[in-house]
Curated annotation (Swiss-Prot):
Sample GO molecular function, one term: proton-transporting ATP synthase activity, rotational mechanism
Underlying gene: atpA
Keywords: ATP synthesis, ATP-binding, CF(1), Chloroplast, Hydrogen ion transport, Ion transport, Membrane, Nucleotide-binding, Plastid, Thylakoid, Translocase, Transport
Protein name (Swiss-Prot/TrEMBL): ATP synthase subunit alpha, chloroplastic
Ranges annotated as biased composition (Basic and acidic residues): 282-303
């Protein structure tokens, strides 16, 4: 007769129950009807929303773009080669999110925030949505702190404040990325975290930017998010949102961040590809009708926070490529309308050897002057006005055989001022040296020199001031003002250097 032991049976059942690790979940699933070019048309799942993540049975994740009565169109975030007709797909009920932490500093990641630099995994402290609401009006405060770029052509005349959105716009090969790259090393010691987002570029230029950051010691406070032209269009579309999420992580921890989007026009091309393949209705230049909503979302999250959220800030600097200087094209105007100003780089100035090729007349900064220090305000106004008015006499002088004296003087002053704004790369200037150089041009101290003598002399003049006449810098640096004593000493120093420079030329 079988001997039944109830206590032993109970212990076996309890042990097996404790080891049971299967979970029961309710998911809305669907079936792939058609797949190709990274686009899947799915029958079901019920209730899927636009922007929701969907997952195939092999683990490939995609984003639902179209939600129609009987099917949904989704774009794959991978190569999509393993997805076949008849495959099962489930709705996750989530939107895209990434891991974030301080460990991302000094690293290179892709749109899903996975490392791509071969230095191992990145320890994450928390997840963050790639698309989150921008700070509200109550959470913001007016821009009042300067974001120094170290460029004499921008800081005095087109100033940028922390929390501002300043566009860098220009034709191909005019130095847009160079301006952004030069700004990053200048943030050393300023408690600023930099986020560089490369969108749809070739792999070699993106790698060169990262290498430049490493050479200048800027990578220790920089995060690079790179999605080159090879990955799927979905990754290029998501890259700016990943960068914005990383910048927000630091901003809400009372840090100041600078995020560079290079460049949103490539994101628009990727979004156009994503939209045309699922047969969404095309609009102007074949872009979908909601492309004006595409570009404002990442820059709008830039802000200067008020005291309650911690007074952190995110400064956004998108770069956009124009064709033949056409700033009124569709994508450039979309991005321009979302920013607080623009730094316009001219192809004509670039071809003439002016670096950086900033066109002061077209460039503007709407909220930046409120963040400018007093010393820079005191000296910059006159120089900006002269450079903005210089284009007209310069153009007329090319056709006039004998221009009048006033036109000749104005043209000569403009040429000298332009020479003073030339700056080699990389050579960021501290504020006090920018003030001295700008004041020298605005006050006419360089008028006694021939234009040929002005070429190369600004760097020598700054070196002379630092070595022999440090008093003006010692006044400007702590007080942020340009006093009469500083002006007097600076005038004497420039006069001495000009005389010695002219003497050397004669010898």
């Amino acid at each position: 007769m079988v001997n039944i032991r109830p206590d032993e049976t109970s212990s076996i059942i309890l042990g097996q129950t404790a080891q049971y690790d299967q979970e029961v979940g309710v998911f809305s699933t669907g079936t792939v009807l058609q797949v190709g070019d990274g686009i899947a048309r799915i029958h079901g799942p019920d209730g899927v929303t636009a922007g929701e993540l969907v997952e195939s049975e092999d683990g490939t994740v995609g984003i639902a773009l179209n939600s129609e009565p009987d099917n949904a169109g989704a774009v794959s975030m991978g190569d999509g080669s393993t997805i076949q007709e008849g495959s099962s797909v489930k709705a996750t009920g989530k939107i895209a999110q990434i891991p974030v932490s301080d460990a991302y500093l000094g690293r290179v990641a892709n749109a899903p925030a996975q490392p791509t630099d071969g230095k191992g995994r990145i320890a994450a402290s928390e997840p963050r949505l790639t698309e989150s609401p921008a700070p509200g009006i109550i959470s913001r405060r007016s821009v009042y702190e300067p974001m120094q770029t170290g460029l004499i052509a921008t800081d005095p005349m087109i100033p940028t404040g922390r929390g501002q959105r300043e566009l860098i716009i220009g034709d191909r090969q005019t130095g847009k990325t160079a301006v952004a790259i030069d700004t990053t090393p200048n943030q050393r010691g300023q408690n600023v975290i930099c986020v560089y987002v490369a969108i749809g570029q070739k792999a070699s230029p993106a790698a060169q930017v990262v290498s430049t950051f490493e050479e200048r010691g800027a990578m220790e406070y920089t995060v690079a998010v790179a999605e080159t032209a090879n990955p799927p269009a979905t990754s290029q579309y998501l890259a700016p949102y990943t960068g914005a999420a990383l910048a927000e992580y630091f901003m809400y921890r009372k840090r100041h961040t600078l995020i560079i989007y290079d460049d949103p026009s490539k994101q628009a091309q990727a979004y156009r590809q994503m939209s045309l393949l699922p047969r969404r209705p095309p609009g102007r230049e074949a872009h979908p009708g909601d492309v004006p909503h595409l570009h404002p979302r990442p820059p709008e999250r830039a802000a200067k926070l008020s005291s309650q959220p911690g007074e952190g800030s995110t400064t956004a600097s998108p770069t956009v490529e124009t064709q033949a200087g056409d700033v009124s094209a569709y994508i450039p105007t979309n991005v321009t309308s979302t920013t607080d100003g623009q730094i316009f780089l001219s192809a004509d100035l670039s071809n003439a050897g002016v670096r950086p090729a900033t066109n002061v007349g077209i460039s503007a900064s709407r909220v930046g002057p409120a963040a400018q220090i007093k010393a820079t305000k005191q000296v910059a106004g006159k120089s900006k006005s002269e450079l903005a008015q210089f284009a007209e006499p310069e153009a007329s002088a090319q056709f006039a055989s004998d221009p009048d004296k006033a036109t000749r003087n104005q043209s000569a002053r403009g040429q000298r001022s332009r020479e003073l704004l030339k700056q080699s790369q990389p050579a960021p200037l501290p504020v006090e040296e920018q003030v001295a150089t700008t004041h020298a041009g605005a006050s006419g101290f360089s008028d006694v020199s021939e234009i040929g003598q002005v070429q190369g002399s600004p760097a020598q003049s700054r070196e002379y001031l630092v070595t022999n006449k440090p008093e003006p810098a010692e006044i400007v640096r702590p007080t942020k003002t340009f006093t009469e004593r500083a002006e007097t000493i600076l005038k004497e120093a420039i006069k001495e250097h000009t005389e010695s420079f002219s003497l050397k030329k004669q010898i």
